[in-house]
A protein has these predicted regions:
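Substrate/ligand-engaging "lid" and interaction regions
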Residues: 1-528
Length: 528
């Protein structure tokens, strides 16, 4: 069973279907020909998340029979992804959905019609220019990671031969401008707040620099800033797509599926002919298009206003997901866990995040209307966290914690104060912040040293708790005031807000001795 056999009209469909593989229900070659002649969608970034989510959404739309064109992928970072994960398999791939029950679902993704290298030095560049000059093009989307939106002075100075992703895209947009000021929408689908604005800022920076250097006209800059021609809508995307999983590979081998080789490129991209991803997914998109909108709602995309996209992001980051993740990360490191899916089976941990989410944070949640916050938390706790295929660790989530506490917990505390709500309702959030001081000590609940995860303020903050020792009675906890007064870390001065004594009491309990983290956590969640 190989992917390329699916392009043979005489392949044995029953063999695949009997083993649980969902096959395309559309004419692959007809879609490819139509897309080549009249492309509507090009996507930059050919990584795992693209195949698992945007390409799969379009695959669903094609399967519905209500759409007839595919997506062209262009890789901006790693040419080997095209050479090793697309070309040998005729741009077909296998999506394996990882369910929290431990089972999998298998679907052939055939919506990708071309795979190109976005490199001005290579022959694919001419095809990319042709695509951008075609009036039918509606959407250029991106999953290039948050780092992909970076640029620097050196690349700006390279003129119309840039090396960074946004410079390349701006050069292609210049071709579209010269073809008749044709409209197009640029859609970031990367997991970062206000992603469309990041994309817009980068494109504008290149165009304005080129205009200043006399390489393009100011009319090109005006074209990019004309929202009747070019838009940069925001989106909120959420779907975990880990590296190819060994258990998945074994399950596919047992089926007789032969395209299961791991691929690691010279640039350390990890991929395979199959892509495995969690079953849960969200894509909320600002409905702001200039040349028509692709019917991705057929695949489950929710179109809405920019304000609502922002509310969904705020709901996730301040209440329904990120704070719970950080609470698990801090206590997970202290309690010796190295896998999130194992940690969520701990009754005290589960109770901690349930009560933080439903009882303490929910009274001030930003409700976007388009998603239900209670249901979102329920799916997160009951389906996403226990998923045995997810390799996420407390140690990874604990990275850069000092940069996250203000938004993940400080915002909730500030809303309580601003709205005059009863601050005594906040019990477990202060406990998590107190546990952060214990975490900074770098000694787990068994008394064994551990290395806190990388953080730009780690050395500075560890020095602030250095006077404290585990198991020492009658020690002076006054050093905590300097830490918990840091507005840059917590979003507010917790002592000034009246939480100082409460946090000190929790820290004292957590530092009491071996096993005190477990004892304190259990006591707090049971009392709550």
């Amino acid at each position: 069973m190989r992917l390329t056999t699916l392009l043979n009209s005489h392949y044995n469909a029953a063999e695949w279907e009997n083993k649980g593989y969902e096959l395309p229900r559309f004419d692959i070659q007809a879609v490819r020909q139509k897309t080549f002649e009249e492309p509507t969608w090009i996507h930059f970034g050919g990584g795992n998340i693209f195949r698992a989510f945007p390409a799969a959404l379009l695959n669903d739309a094609l399967n519905s029979g209500k759409y007839d064109r595919g997506v062209i992928v262009a890789e901006t970072f790693d040419d080997e992804v095209i050479d090793k994960a697309y070309t040998p398999y005729d741009n077909l791939s296998l999506l394996v959905s990882l369910k929290s029950t431990g089972k999998i679902e298998k679907k052939i993704i055939a919506s990708v019609t071309e795979a190109l290298k976005a490199n001005p030095q290579l022959s694919d560049w001419k095809r990319l220019i042709d695509i951008f000059c075609n009036p039918t093009l509606q959407l250029a989307s991106f999953t290039i990671t948050e780092k992909g939106y970076n640029f620097n002075e050196d690349d700006l100075a390279r003129g119309l031969n840039p090396q960074f992703a946004l410079g390349k895209v701006t050069a292609l947009l210049h071709a579209r401008y010269k073809a008749g000021r044709l409209p197009v929408t640029l859609q970031s689908m990367d997991n970062c707040s206000h992603n469309g604005s990041k994309l817009q800022a980068g494109v504008f920076a290149y165009a304005e620099r080129w205009a200043k250097d006399g390489l393009v006209s100011m009319e090109f800059v005006d074209y990019l800033k004309d929202e009747s021609k070019v838009t940069f809508p925001w989106s909120m995307i959420d779907k975990i797509t880990p590296r190819p999983h060994a258990k998945v590979k074994a399950l596919l081998e047992a089926d007789g599926f032969e395209d299961n080789d791991y691929i690691e490129t010279a640039r350390h991209t990890f991929t395979a002919p199959f892509v495995n991803a969690e079953e849960t997914q969200y894509l909320i998109v600002e409905d702001h298009y200039t040349n028509g909108r692709l019917p991705l709602d057929l695949g489950g995309v929710l179109f809405t206003s920019r304000e609502t996209v922002d509310k969904v992001e705020t709901m996730k980051v301040t209440t329904c997901l990120n704070p719970l993740h950080t609470a698990m990360a801090i206590f997970g490191c202290l309690l010796g866990y190295d896998l999130i899916s194992a940690e969520i089976a701990d009754p005290d941990i589960r109770s901690l995040i349930q009560k933080i989410g439903y009882i303490e944070a929910m009274p001030v949640v930003v409700d976007p209307g388009i998603l239900n916050p209670y249901e979102f938390i329920g799916v997160f706790i009951n389906k996403r966290l226990p998923n045995p295929f997810m390799p996420d660790t407390p140690q990874r989530i604990a990275m850069d914690t000092s940069q996250k506490l203000a938004i993940r917990f400080g915002e909730t505390i500030k809303k309580y104060i601003k709205r005059g709500l009863d601050k005594s309702n906040l019990v477990l959030i202060p406990l998590v912040l107190a546990a952060y001081a214990r975490y900074l000590k770098g000694i787990d609940d068994e008394g064994k040293p551990f290395n806190p995860s990388p953080d730009p303020l780690l050395n500075e903050l560890q020095a602030m708790v250095s006077p404290l020792e585990i198991g020492h009675e009658n020690q002076d906890f006054s050093c905590l005031k300097a830490l918990f007064s840091r507005e840059d870390i917590f979003g507010l001065d917790l002592y000034e807000a009246g939480f100082g004594p409460q946090i000190e009491a929790a820290v004292k309990a957590l530092f009491a001795g071996k096993g005190s983290v477990r004892t304190t956590l259990h006591r707090y969640v049971m009392a709550r």
